[in-house]
């Protein structure tokens, strides 16, 4: 039996909502704008989780690496050519700020593209509401984009609070957003549980001194969730509710 909780904090992408297609589309539209190679769904899974800017950076790194690999092959044959190829890779990375701004500018029109709530999540939220448990969405995505997605898929009173990237508060795995939510709700970190699908979420929970639950249906594998300290692993929203009800309510 765990401590009785008063709040459940949820990550967004890969936890509440499957947003892979929208993330992939926005990135590929961005890369097309710069005549660069886009990402697959698997790459999207791997690259997201630590904020939109990091997603853009990792995609640019993938493109730059093509030039760096070519440069390495030419190092012994033609040093000057190798340096030129290296510079092309550097030029790709120099576009980070501009590419990130472009990504942000087009994301609002794509953010609900093929998005859907994961099985059992809506009923889990309803059950928590019925029990008087606070429901908070804490995401590294910009808050305004998160709100658009949540408004499309969930009832208006599904969440007591939504926190996201505002360029002021450090992102997960820093615990500041989690601790801020606790303060605003008037609870201790031991009275909240973090539910997420990546090490970013689980590390944030650990740094805030709270228990975490890992979502096997999200963007990362079981091993990552286990290594980063998930107390429980769940396959869908129904199992999440059962765990919460049995151990923490």
Language-model segments: which ranges?
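Hydrophobic alpha-helical packing elements
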Residues: 19, 23, 55, 95, ...
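Solvent-exposed, charged/polar functional surfaces in cytosolic regulatory/catalytic domains
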Residues: 29, 33, 54, 58, ...
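Asp-based, Mg2+/Mn2+-dependent phosphohydrolase catalytic module
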Residues: 1-8, 42, 66, 129, ...
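Substrate-recognition element of Asp-dependent hydrolases with the DxDx(T/V) motif
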Residues: 27, 121-150
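Metal-dependent phosphoesterase signature
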Residues: 58-123, 131
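Residues at secondary-structure transition points
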Residues: 14, 18, 39, 43, ...
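Active-site neighborhood of HAD-like aspartate-dependent phosphohydrolases
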Residues: 1-46, 57-60
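An amphipathic alpha-helix signature
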Residues: 24, 28, 45, 49-57, ...
């Amino acid at each position: 039996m765990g401590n009785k909780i008063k709040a459940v904090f949820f990550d967004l992408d890969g936890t509440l909502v499957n947003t892979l297609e929208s993330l992939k589309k926005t990135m590929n539209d961005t890369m097309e704008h710069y005549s660069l190679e886009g990402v697959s769904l698997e790459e999207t899974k791997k690259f997201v989780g630590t904020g939109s800017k990091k997603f853009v950076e990792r995609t640019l790194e993938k493109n730059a690496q093509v030039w760096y690999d070519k440069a390495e092959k030419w190092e012994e044959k033609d040093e000057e050519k190798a340096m030129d190829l290296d510079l092309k890779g550097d030029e790709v990375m120099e576009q980070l700020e501009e590419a990130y701004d472009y990504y942000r500018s087009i994301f609002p029109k794509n953010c609900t593209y093929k998005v859907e709530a994961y099985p059992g999540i809506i009923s889990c939220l309803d059950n928590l509401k019925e029990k008087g448990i606070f429901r908070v969405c804490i995401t590294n995505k910009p808050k305004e984009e998160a709100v658009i997605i949540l408004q499309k898929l969930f009832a208006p009173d599904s969440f007591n609070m939504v926190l996201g990237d505002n360029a002021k508060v450090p992102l997960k795995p820093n615990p500041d957003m989690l601790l801020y939510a606790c303060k605003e709700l008037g609870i201790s970190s031991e009275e909240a549980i973090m539910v997420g699908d990546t090490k970013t979420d689980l590390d944030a929970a650990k740094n805030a001194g709270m228990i975490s639950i890992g979502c096997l249906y999200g963007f990362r594998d079981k091993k990552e969730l286990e290594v980063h300290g998930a107390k429980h692993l769940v396959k869908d929203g129904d199992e999440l509710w059962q765990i919460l009800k049995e151990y923490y309510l």
